[in-house]
């Protein structure tokens, strides 16, 4: 895996053009690993993402007694399913800062039973998990906090499930609902499971990914809009045999935005019209800003069509990819407003605060609300040292501030702690350098 120095100096780039093969989707990779582990049968996973977060999941599954093999040096894996019951009933599991690992694993371990501790880096212990724990403990699982209530670390012990209807708030993180949906088939041997959503559900496209993958592993979920989900009794996860992980649509956003800002065309391969990821709808925002976008079944291409137009839009459905729009707004013809992004506050860092702070370093005027950002672009983007807050998306987003270098020849940008991109895209800066035709150092 690529290792970067403590900082990376990026030079202004005049133009962006080229083709990028995307790494696998983080959301799909970690869901698929857990489903394959819980299934009956053996699953061949192709093009799994190589990253810190998938490594966390693989190591946790190994500690739980799940057998898996990597095929040579490829990103193809064989996972031998345990048919709903982990062989190891006592384990200490390190979760890093991987929300896509700790939340589904918490639910699966709580309903199957055992003696487990789950902990991570310091930021993980600041990310809320109380709504998920409350939903599970209400039906008889036994999950305790070993630190601050409502947050990891967690201690899971064997409980006694006495109910099969759960309720969870939908407005904090969609990963709580994902975790319950993935764990539900482990409880349906004799009785239906019903999951109710309290209030509005954010990030609905991520739930679509979950439902799609659960179905691929043989379980049907009946739904009443976004308010309730029923998993009928008698179902279990069954391996589909082979499954392919499509490219990461959130990672695609940086390259497509580069094409929209600095000429293009820039094409990403591995995700396209047939994607199950909601973040492909990022291109709708680029089109609103005036970019030209083309899509195939497994590729997307974007190019500039003049100066980007300012945008005022609701980004609740694509919170991760929306970060890219915040930086692209530096190049717009007026103030842009990103609305309904409150979930940014509980991600790898408080992304609203972090984004506002770093955009101001570049000369932007930024108004920060509880769930929105207003970005007024500067006349000229300033040189700056960008802090990344151990957040992979902050590092990748702000590489875009090096574009359109003709207008600000001589300005430079420094990315502090570039190694944080290893969470989802270890080779990101090499890929970005290829499409901007600039050396890294």
From Swiss-Prot:
<feature type="binding site">
    <location>
        <position position="203"/>
    </location>
    <ligand>
        <name>3-phosphoshikimate</name>
    </ligand>
</feature>
<dbReference type="GO" id="GO:0009423">
    <property type="term" value="P:chorismate biosynthetic process"/>
</dbReference>
<dbReference type="GO" id="GO:0008652">
    <property type="term" value="P:amino acid biosynthetic process"/>
</dbReference>
<dbReference type="GO" id="GO:0009073">
    <property type="term" value="P:aromatic amino acid family biosynthetic process"/>
</dbReference>
<feature type="binding site">
    <location>
        <position position="175"/>
    </location>
    <ligand>
        <name>phosphoenolpyruvate</name>
    </ligand>
</feature>
<comment type="subunit">
    <text>Monomer.</text>
</comment>
<dbReference type="InterPro" id="IPR001986">
    <property type="entry name" value="Enolpyruvate_Tfrase_dom"/>
</dbReference>
<feature type="binding site">
    <location>
        <position position="99"/>
    </location>
    <ligand>
        <name>phosphoenolpyruvate</name>
    </ligand>
</feature>
<keyword id="KW-0963">Cytoplasm</keyword>
<comment type="similarity">
    <text>Belongs to the EPSP synthase family.</text>
</comment>
<feature type="binding site">
    <location>
        <position position="175"/>
    </location>
    <ligand>
        <name>3-phosphoshikimate</name>
    </ligand>
</feature>
<comment type="pathway">
    <text>Metabolic intermediate biosynthesis; chorismate biosynthesis; chorismate from D-erythrose 4-phosphate and phosphoenolpyruvate: step 6/7.</text>
</comment>
<feature type="binding site">
    <location>
        <position position="26"/>
    </location>
    <ligand>
        <name>phosphoenolpyruvate</name>
    </ligand>
</feature>
<feature type="binding site">
    <location>
        <position position="174"/>
    </location>
    <ligand>
        <name>3-phosphoshikimate</name>
    </ligand>
</feature>
<keyword id="KW-0057">Aromatic amino acid biosynthesis</keyword>
<feature type="binding site">
    <location>
        <position position="31"/>
    </location>
    <ligand>
        <name>3-phosphoshikimate</name>
    </ligand>
</feature>
<feature type="binding site">
    <location>
        <position position="127"/>
    </location>
    <ligand>
        <name>phosphoenolpyruvate</name>
    </ligand>
</feature>
<feature type="active site" description="Proton acceptor">
    <location>
        <position position="320"/>
    </location>
</feature>
<dbReference type="GO" id="GO:0003866">
    <property type="term" value="F:3-phosphoshikimate 1-carboxyvinyltransferase activity"/>
</dbReference>
<feature type="binding site">
    <location>
        <position position="320"/>
    </location>
    <ligand>
        <name>3-phosphoshikimate</name>
    </ligand>
</feature>
<feature type="binding site">
    <location>
        <position position="26"/>
    </location>
    <ligand>
        <name>3-phosphoshikimate</name>
    </ligand>
</feature>
<feature type="binding site">
    <location>
        <position position="393"/>
    </location>
    <ligand>
        <name>phosphoenolpyruvate</name>
    </ligand>
</feature>
<dbReference type="GO" id="GO:0005737">
    <property type="term" value="C:cytoplasm"/>
</dbReference>
<keyword id="KW-0808">Transferase</keyword>
<feature type="binding site">
    <location>
        <position position="27"/>
    </location>
    <ligand>
        <name>3-phosphoshikimate</name>
    </ligand>
</feature>
<feature type="binding site">
    <location>
        <position position="173"/>
    </location>
    <ligand>
        <name>3-phosphoshikimate</name>
    </ligand>
</feature>
<feature type="binding site">
    <location>
        <position position="423"/>
    </location>
    <ligand>
        <name>phosphoenolpyruvate</name>
    </ligand>
</feature>
<protein>
    <recommendedName>
        <fullName>3-phosphoshikimate 1-carboxyvinyltransferase</fullName>
        <ecNumber>2.5.1.19</ecNumber>
    </recommendedName>
</protein>
<dbReference type="Pfam" id="PF00275">
    <property type="entry name" value="EPSP_synthase"/>
</dbReference>
<keyword id="KW-0028">Amino-acid biosynthesis</keyword>
<feature type="binding site">
    <location>
        <position position="347"/>
    </location>
    <ligand>
        <name>3-phosphoshikimate</name>
    </ligand>
</feature>
<comment type="function">
    <text>Catalyzes the transfer of the enolpyruvyl moiety of phosphoenolpyruvate (PEP) to the 5-hydroxyl of shikimate-3-phosphate (S3P) to produce enolpyruvyl shikimate-3-phosphate and inorganic phosphate.</text>
</comment>
<dbReference type="InterPro" id="IPR023193">
    <property type="entry name" value="EPSP_synthase_CS"/>
</dbReference>
<dbReference type="InterPro" id="IPR006264">
    <property type="entry name" value="EPSP_synthase"/>
</dbReference>
<dbReference type="InterPro" id="IPR013792">
    <property type="entry name" value="RNA3'P_cycl/enolpyr_Trfase_a/b"/>
</dbReference>
<feature type="binding site">
    <location>
        <position position="351"/>
    </location>
    <ligand>
        <name>phosphoenolpyruvate</name>
    </ligand>
</feature>
<dbReference type="InterPro" id="IPR036968">
    <property type="entry name" value="Enolpyruvate_Tfrase_sf"/>
</dbReference>
